[in-house]
Amino acid sequence: FETFNFDGNDKFIVADGNNAPTVFNTSFSATDVSSAGSGEVSTAVTGAKFVKVLKNHMFYAGMSSTPQEIVFSVPFDEDNFATGSGAGSIKVDDTIVGLKVFRQDLFIFCENRIFKLSGSSLSDFVITPVTRDIGCVNGQTIQEFAGDLIFLAPDGLRTVAGTARIGDVELGTISANV
């Protein structure tokens, strides 16, 4: 789940990997999120496993029909996918297993690769590879700890360390090979 406040009302959104993501407000009123219709991205977010908020957009991933795609909403509206208003989708070249917002970027963990999405809107979102050599075994292992991201890789626990240079990251191993 993810908490957010786009319109002055606290809400949280739940994605279960089978149904449409559901938004709950403070009075526990539920609204399903779906995408279809003119001007909207072609891929539905029904069945999303992962949902994160970054730069006032809602990002959805892990749909079984498009496991390599991230769909994002227009700014400040979790269920509007009109491409002419700032929504869109991005594909990576591996199956997505988890998402994590870290230092104002969205880290996209895949089975065999890790990517970083930077920017603040459709016009300047950029995906850069963090590594194409190792991925994440299970997205539920991605955790922020002591100012770093830790995740379970095929060879043990690893970190995505932010270095002193802005926008630069490095990978480190913190366990013996598994």
Segments from the language model and where they lie:
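Disordered, low-complexity "stalk" and linker segments at domain junctions of extracellular
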Residues: 1-55, 59
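Beta-sheet-dominated scaffold domains
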Residues: 3-7, 12, 56-57, 65, ...
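Surface-exposed loop/turn elements that mediate protein-protein interactions on large endomembrane-trafficking
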Residues: 20-36, 66-88, 115-126, 158-174
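N-terminal beta-propeller domains
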Residues: 34-116
